[in-house]
Regions:
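Short, Lys/Arg-enriched N-terminal segments with co-localized hydrophobic residues
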Residues: 11-20
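N-terminal intrinsically disordered, cationic/polar leader segments
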Residues: 19-298
Length: 298
């Protein structure tokens, strides 16, 4: 009986073959490689600190499907490469260093077809000492984090720059009215409110600028000028105006993607304590928050 059942099962199972599995996408690399470089010009020093990630695509299928590591570039080797090229090539321009890394991996490893380099900069400012900036002492600069994303192929290179984690706020010149109202709506309309957001913006270069860092600074300045000086009827409208300002300021970029989470500042109810709150005291909240995103292009 057991033999009969086994034969019966094997005959039936032959009709229901499990389809072959295949690997449809892969990449790998080294992440969170931190480098800090000191530039010395006499007694005056400057520093640049980056967190780098390198991801490779190419002929690595066998390492996943056959445990064949012969073409695998060890991630420890990637780390060493980043450190070496930082010593040799890292200067003021984050994007130039990313391009150098991408070019190196494509030139050195013929089986690599695509290199994605992510770079996040940790900015430093000079510590005031004796009424002037100190020559070689620094503190963390601001809240914004500049970053870059470099994609290199054998056909071309793509450079994207941006900033993230920039908390900006205006105490007036902002409102929100005439929005859709239905049975789920409780939000009151207003023509005067606090507008606060943690800005993230990334712009794509269509050609190389004279200086990536100066261009990035001008783009951010243009967007912040709109935020500060223009009345905001909604985060959506302000996002679009900021994107247009970026494109107008820098003709070398093709588009800008902006994320502006609406970090609500809620008026504190002081009436139980016999006090009136005339738009003076708020509770800033991170969640839940409105998530406003948009891309503006030419």
């Amino acid at each position: 009986m057991r033999i009969f059942c086994w034969k019966f099962w094997t005959k039936r199972s032959a009709r229901f073959k499990v389809p072959a599995m295949k690997l449809i996408q892969h990449h790998y690399g080294k992440a969170r490689v931190r480098v800090l470089k000191v530039f010395r010009k006499g007694a005056r020093h400057s520093v640049k600190e980056l967190e780098v990630q390198v991801m490779l695509e190419g002929n690595f299928d066998a390492s996943f499907t056959k445990a064949d590591n012969r073409l695998v570039v060890a991630t420890d080797s990637m780390k060493n490469t980043i450190n070496i090229l930082a010593r040799q090539k890292l200067g003021a321009e984050t994007e130039e260093f990313g391009l150098a890394l991408g070019a190196h991996f494509l030139k050195t490893y013929r089986h690599v077809s695509r290199v994605e380099v992510g770079l996040t900069e940790h900015c430093w400012a000079r510590i005031p000492a004796g009424g002037k900036p100190h020559a070689h002492s620094f503190s963390e600069k601001g809240a914004a984090t500049p970053f870059a994303k470099i994609t290199c192929t054998r056909k071309d290179n793509q450079v994207e720059s941006g900033i993230k984690d920039l908390l900006i706020l205006k105490t007036t010149a902002s409102g929100f009215k005439n929005f859709l109202r239905d049975e789920f709506t409780t939000l009151p309309e207003t023509s005067d409110r606090i507008l606060a957001t943690k800005l993230r913006a990334v712009w794509r270069y269509r050609k190389k600028p004279g200086s990536y860092s100066r261009t990035n600074e001008k783009i951010l300045e243009a967007m912040l000028a709109v935020f500060a000086t223009k009345y905001s009827p909604s985060v959506q409208a302000t996002l679009f105006q900021m994107g247009k300002a970026a494109l107008k300021t820098a003709l070398v970029i093709s588009k800008v993607q902006i994320t502006m989470p609406n970090r609500h500042c809620l008026l504190i109810n002081l009436s139980p304590f016999g006090l009136e709150n005339k738009n003076e005291l708020f509770v800033p909240t991170d969640e839940p928050h409105g998530q406003i995103e948009g891309t503006v292009s030419r």
